[in-house]
Swiss-Prot record:
A Gene Ontology BP annotation from the UniProt entry: vitamin E biosynthetic process
Stretch list, region Disordered: 1-48
Region of interest (SAM motif III), ranges: 211-224
Transmembrane segments: 318-338
Provenance organism: Oryza sativa subsp. japonica (Rice)
Entry protein name: 2-methyl-6-phytyl-1,4-hydroquinone methyltransferase 2, chloroplastic
Lipid bilayer topology: Single-pass membrane protein
Membrane topology, Chloroplast intermembrane segments: 60-317
Chain segments carrying region SAM motif II: 170-183
Segments for region (SAM motif I): 125-134
Pathway per the UniProt entry: Cofactor biosynthesis; tocopherol biosynthesis
Length: 348
């Protein structure tokens, strides 16, 4: 579920449209840093073998921000748009059958979408970074397909989505999660699953989520959780963005969202969401309480389009990112085996 490319122009802006059948990789690599302030957050958890837990009060320190703790400029081998584009060209072949069973099951998907409150089939919903349409399949169970838009950067992923019979009425398009090609106040629900980890500037993407929602609309962001175990943290930080729970909350609040809540998710046999992280480890929701654009002001989007990519550097980054990804394919297998051995109720 890769991040969307800039194949479409934002509302009121100027952009280019790819010709049908033509595959054009995105050109940007830009990074920017964000900062957070100390604020309390509300956390609930479901899944991961633990069921519901009591609401906890956490306080995030300034040192937990992405800028202070894990600078956006540090190497992440698949977070860059170009690497992600080619990575998903090959991964799209096996994504639904190899990746999803360990990281994004149907039960997890339905559980994660519950806070989005898809109560009516008439709701207008956008699935940003929807990839092969696995999350969209969960959406169209509750919303009429003609009211749903699926947007992603990868034409290879989107081709897989177009093959799904249940998505025949869905509008499927290429686009950029940080520069959405929709007018302000368009959708009732914004959903994004497994995409934020590829965004060079997560705050900008969440600001866009706020902009395209109507008054009273709900954004539901489903993504990874930063691990606490040193080896998993090493691979996570090298691979792509695994935000801390506090960072999700802070990004939502800065964008203008109210009633921000976070829920941990995970396969029932995966008793280690916080220890090892998980590509789909939490579901964050926020409500838009005012008309119009986000109150947050950001500078121009930074894109490195002038410098050509060194093929050797690109290959190195791609291979290293693939190694990190392989680790996170093996972790669920390891956790499943441990779940069969370690008695239920005991930490693993």
């Amino acid at each position: 579920m890769a991040m969307a490319s800039s194949a479409y122009a934002p509302a009121g802006g100027v952009g280019t449209h790819s010709a049908p059948g033509r595959i054009r990789p995105p050109r940007g690599l830009g990074f920017s840093t964000t900062t957070t302030k100390s604020r309390p957050l509300v956390l609930t958890r479901r899944g991961g073998g633990g069921g519901n837990i009591s609401v906890a009060r956490l306080r995030c320190a300034a040192s937990s921000s992405s800028a202070a703790a894990r600078p956006m400029s540090q190497p992440r081998f698949i977070q860059h748009k170009k690497e992600a584009f080619w990575f998903y060209r090959f991964l799209s072949i096996v994504y639904d059958h190899v990746i999803n069973p360990g990281h994004w099951t149907e039960d997890m998907r339905d559980d994660a979408l519950e806070p989005a409150d898809l109560y009516s089939r008439k709701l207008r919903v956008v699935d940003v970074g929807g990839g092969t349409g696995f999350t969209t399949l969960g959406i169209v169970k509750r919303v009429d397909p003609e009211n749903v838009t699926l947007l992603d950067q990868s034409p290879h992923q989107l081709e897989k989505a177009r093959e799904k019979e249940a998505l025949k009425g869905v509008t499927i398009m290429e686009g950029d999660a940080e520069d959405l090609p929709f007018p302000t106040d368009t959708f009732d629900r914004y959903v994004s699953a497994g995409s934020i980890e590829y965004w060079p500037d997560p705050q900008r993407g969440i600001k866009e989520a706020y902009r395209v929602l109507r008054l009273g609309g709900v954004a539901c962001m489903i993504g990874p959780v930063h691990p606490t175990f040193w080896l998993s943290r090493f691979f996570a930080d090298m691979w792509m963005l695994f935000p801390k729970e506090e960072e999700y909350i802070e990004w939502f609040k800065k964008a203008g969202f109210k009633d921000v809540k976070l829920k941990r998710i995970g396969p029932k046999w995966y008793r280690g969401v916080r220890r090892h992280g998980l590509i789909m480890g939490c579901s964050v929701t926020g409500v838009k309480r005012e008309h119009g654009d986000s109150p947050l002001q950001l500078g121009p989007k930074v894109e490195d389009v002038s410098k050509p990519v060194n093929p050797i550097t690109f290959l190195f980054r791609f291979l290293m990112g693939t190694i990190c990804a392989a680790y996170y394919v093996l972790v669920p297998i390891y956790m499943w085996i441990k779940d069969q051995i370690v008695p239920k109720g005991m930490p693993i």
